[in-house]
Swiss-Prot record:
Protein name as catalogued: Small ribosomal subunit protein bS16
One Gene Ontology biological process: translation
Signal peptide: none
GO cellular component: cytoplasm; small ribosomal subunit
Keyword Ribosomal protein (UniProt): yes
Biased composition (Acidic residues): 120-130
Compositional bias (Low complexity): 110-119, 131-146
Organism in which the protein naturally occurs: Rhodopirellula baltica (strain DSM 10527 / NCIMB 13988 / SH1)
Entry-linked PANTHER family: 30S RIBOSOMAL PROTEIN S16, SMALL RIBOSOMAL SUBUNIT PROTEIN BS16M
Length: 146
């Protein structure tokens, strides 16, 4: 059985996401995998934070004779055990992990709430005289029919 280390496509339309997997060479791209070795997210804003690899497992599979695909070979070279971009990757992951400071919304919406509270109070008395007028008309109509 010839094993390859290649990417399995996940995600959705216009939002790709890949898993780096050890796969039998004869299986289709998104078919059954032997082991998942990491991820690759091309949509991540930080270039060096796009890839996560289990370096020890990648080394194991390469040691047993697995052949990486071209793109995976580049990722292993950069982010593998002795990768050239490991320090940049750690810094990028830290930048992504930080939460943005919370800024409270401006105070402008508060004055708008006060006039809204007065408006329903004005409408309520306007409805009451209309109800009284209808009750006054009813007895007058009965008196004329008699």
């Amino acid at each position: 059985m010839a094993v390859r280390i290649r990417m399995k496509k996940m995600g959705r339309t216009h939002r790709p996401f890949f898993r780096v997997c050890a796969v039998d060479q004869r299986n289709p791209r998104d078919g059954r995998v032997i082991e998942e070795l990491g991820t690759y997210d091309p949509m991540c804003p930080e270039t060096d934070a796009r890839t996560t690899l289990k370096a020890d497992r990648v080394d194991y599979w390469i040691g047993v004779g697995a052949q990486p695909s071209d793109k995976v070979a580049v990722l292993i070279k950069k982010y593998g055990t002795d990768g050239s971009h490991l320090e940049a990757q750690k810094a990028a992951v830290e930048r992504l992990g930080r939460r943005k400071d919370y800024t409270p919304p401006p105070e402008a919406p508060a004055p708008k709430a006060a006039p809204v509270a007065e408006a329903p109070a004005e409408e309520a008395p306007a409805e009451e005289p209309a109800a009284e007028a209808s009750t006054d008309d009813a007895p007058a109509a009965e008196a004329t029919t008699e």
